[in-house]
């Protein structure tokens, strides 16, 4: 049985001028592909994330072929060798595996002589086909799900939505990538972030730990920009870079010959912000949800002479943006509670942040929002500035919005929605200026002098000071959080032990 798209009675095709692809919805595309995955593949041998990744590879090849076949001046020069897709549909077994391996190696080559392949170079970088024993399933994916349809006719927004939905459905696999600390950021949160940051069409937005690229997509959609250099990201996980590049391509509709929007890089080793190589323009906005912890990668920032102290991943990413952004740039950085009240490096960075930036807003996020992480999260909003000549702090007031107390969420049964942050956005943007903000039960102002008066300049603040036990989460989540804190403590003790003579 072939699982196609569109209505079997032809109604959708007739309504769309004989092309059913024009009426496809993102949810429908994702559902059909997951049905194929569950019924036509070995789900034990192929993870959901591997399935989505290979769907992305094959869709790239098919779209490139279709664009090259357009009539006259509408045709695009193919990035992939001409005739690749038709030949691929006739292969199976060893021949299919070998051809795909050769293609991935060729397209993933970062050859400077082929600037039109910069995006392909990232989509296929270090990519490998499924195991040889899985080629029958891959051949069916090609011949039953991808080849029969004209994917360039699918509305661009729906195609992008389908890929984003499928990535979201891979949350279990992504959360297992504990070696690089990956997680998925709910779109309603990102929607609120870009509104509060006031992202504009002329902005250049970066994410130095971009994961699947969702932050950049949210910014791009809010900007409605036509400039391909408007967004740029980096990640140290090659698989995430491949997925993020494809995710951005499908959500923005950019030509495959454009410069790559994402690069494979360890941002913390670089003393410069993420920029697009084709433009070199410095960013005006940064949005970052960095790894909160990692079991396989130690923060490598010890060679940074522009760092004041060396801490965990979120502390180092916060510091990286503080020192590399140009004056006037705006930022929103996700941080766990420990960065808000921890001593040592975290306290040093907090004091420097208050001194050199206008740290104007802290959003305490609902508990349970990030899948299986067991940590409480926050977002710090700040604007980079130049130091005051009299050594006073640039920050005058820190406004704290408490969206956490009494608001426990999960990413599946009770996910956050945009309505959860409507009041936050309204409170932040009231009057069009920070000076026009007013306090409420959930929104409170803290003068910077009060923050600095504390020995550690703690940001462990609440807008609603009433004790509320409902925001602690379930016993399982509390236990997970304790385990995370113990892991962090063990890491610090190991560092102390190694430093002792």
Predicted features and spans:
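Conserved S-adenosyl-L-methionine
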Residues: 179-285, 293-297, 304, 311, ...
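Short, amphipathic alpha-helical segments that act as regulatory/interfacial helices
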Residues: 37, 55-65, 104, 108, ...
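Structural motif
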Residues: 41-53, 133, 151-158, 473
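S-adenosyl-L-methionine
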Residues: 50-53, 58-59, 64, 160-168, ...
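Non-catalytic accessory regions of SAM-dependent methyltransferases
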Residues: 2-82, 500
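Long recognition/docking surfaces used for binding and targeting
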Residues: 66-174
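Active-site-adjacent bridging/hinge elements
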Residues: 25-34, 163-168, 296
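A conserved structural/catalytic subdomain of Rossmann-like adenosyl-cofactor enzymes
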Residues: 2-22, 269-270, 274-501
């Amino acid at each position: 049985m072939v699982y196609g798209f569109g209505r079997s009675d032809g109604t959708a095709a007739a309504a769309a001028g004989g092309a059913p692809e024009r009426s496809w919805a993102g949810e429908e595309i994702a559902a059909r592909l997951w049905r194929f995955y569950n019924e036509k593949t070995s789900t034990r041998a192929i993870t959901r994330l591997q399935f989505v990744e290979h769907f992305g590879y094959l869709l790239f090849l098919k779209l490139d072929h279709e664009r090259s076949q357009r009539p006259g001046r509408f045709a695009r020069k193919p990035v992939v060798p001409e005739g690749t897709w038709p030949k691929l549909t006739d292969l199976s077994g060893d021949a299919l595996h070998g051809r795909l391996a050769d293609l991935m190696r060729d397209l993933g080559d970062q050859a400077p002589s082929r600037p039109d392949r910069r995006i392909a170079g990232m989509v296929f970088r270090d990519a490998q086909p499924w195991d040889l024993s899985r080629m029958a399933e891959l051949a069916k994916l090609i011949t039953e799900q991808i080849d029969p349809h004209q994917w360039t006719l699918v509305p661009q927004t729906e195609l992008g939505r389908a890929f984003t939905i499928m990535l979201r459905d891979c949350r279990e696999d992504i959360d297992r990538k504990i070696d690089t600390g990956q997680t998925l950021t709910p779109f309603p949160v990102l929607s609120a972030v870009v509104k509060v940051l006031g992202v504009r069409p002329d902005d250049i937005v970066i994410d130095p730990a971009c994961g699947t690229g969702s932050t950049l997509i949210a910014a791009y959609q809010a900007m409605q920009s036509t400039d391909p250099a408007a967004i740029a990201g980096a990640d140290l996980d090659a698989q995430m870079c491949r997925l993020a590049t494809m995710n951005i391509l499908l959500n923005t509709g950019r030509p495959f010959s454009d410069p790559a929007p994402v690069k494979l890089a360890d941002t913390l080793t670089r003393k410069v912000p993420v920029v697009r190589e084709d433009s070199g323009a410095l960013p005006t906005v940064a949005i970052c949800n960095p790894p909160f912890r990692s079991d396989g990668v130690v923060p490598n920032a010890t060679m940074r002479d522009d760092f004041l102290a060396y801490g965990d991943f979120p502390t180092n990413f916060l510091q990286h943006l503080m020192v590399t952004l140009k004056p006037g740039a705006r930022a929103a950085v996700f941080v766990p509670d420990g960065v808000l009240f921890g001593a040592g490096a975290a306290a040093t960075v907090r004091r420097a942040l208050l001194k050199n930036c206008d740290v104007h807003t802290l959003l305490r996020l609902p508990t349970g929002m990030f899948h299986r992480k067991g940590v409480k999260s926050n977002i710090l909003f700040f604007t980079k500035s130049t130091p005051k000549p009299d050594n006073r702090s640039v920050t005058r007031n820190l406004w704290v919005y408490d969206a956490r107390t009494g608001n426990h969420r999960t990413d599946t049964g009770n996910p956050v929605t945009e309505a959860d942050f409507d009041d936050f956005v309204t409170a932040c943007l009231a009057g069009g200026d920070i000076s026009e903000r007013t306090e409420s039960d959930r929104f409170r102002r803290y003068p910077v002098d009060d923050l600095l008066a504390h020995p550690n300049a703690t940001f462990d603040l609440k807008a609603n000071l009433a004790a509320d036990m409902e925001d602690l989460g379930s016993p399982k989540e509390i236990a997970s959080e304790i385990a995370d804190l113990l892991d962090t403590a063990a890491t610090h003790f190991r560092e102390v032990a190694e430093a002792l003579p």
